[in-house]
Amino acid sequence: MTFKRRNGGRNKHGRGHVKYIRCSNCAKCCPKDKAIKRFQVRNIVEQAAIRDVQEACVHDGYVLPKLYAKVHHCVSCAIHAHIVRVRSRENRRDRRPPERFRRREDRPQGPRPGGGAPAPGGAAAPAPNVART
């Protein structure tokens, strides 16, 4: 019979059995090696109160610690939450990890289409005065 994935959707090579975990979203039982695992990094203090806490802090430059929680998702919840995406038959063979998300200021700034200089006669140039006689 044909098979869809080389690993059968699991990371269990050579093991007979692995323990089950509960999905963090729906509490469904899922094998630990099949579950989609991610670290959720959050601030201890919510975004609205960060400045108030830093102003009230005695130490200058104190960095608030973060909460690191490992979340496990079953396949259906991971697809629904766009943590993983359904890929075509050809793209399923691609075993490279997906491209990492980079913040806007970390991206390389290359030449943009249309050039960086303002066009002559654009919005910044004053309109010619034709009413003179």
Curated annotation (Swiss-Prot):
Of the GO CC terms on this record, one is: cytosolic small ribosomal subunit
Q: What is the name listed in the Swiss-Prot or TrEMBL entry for this protein? A: Small ribosomal subunit protein eS26
In residue numbers, the region (Disordered) covers: 87-133
* GO biological process per UniProt: translation
Q: Note whether Glycoprotein occurs among the keywords.
A: no
Q: List the Pfam families hit by this protein, alphabetically.
A: Ribosomal_S26e
What are the alphabetically sorted keywords of the record? Ribonucleoprotein, Ribosomal protein
The family assignment reads:
Belongs to the eukaryotic ribosomal protein eS26 family.
User: Can you name one GO molecular function term for this protein?
Assistant: structural constituent of ribosome
Report if keyword rRNA-binding is assigned. no
Q: Which organism is it from?
A: Oryza sativa subsp. japonica
What InterPro entries does this protein map onto? Answer: Ribosomal_eS26, Ribosomal_eS26_CS, Ribosomal_eS26_sf
What residue spans carry the Low complexity bias annotation?
Answer: 120-133
- Listed Basic and acidic residues bias regions: 87-109
Which superkingdom heads the taxonomic lineage of this protein's source? Eukaryota
Q: Encoded by which gene?
A: RPS26
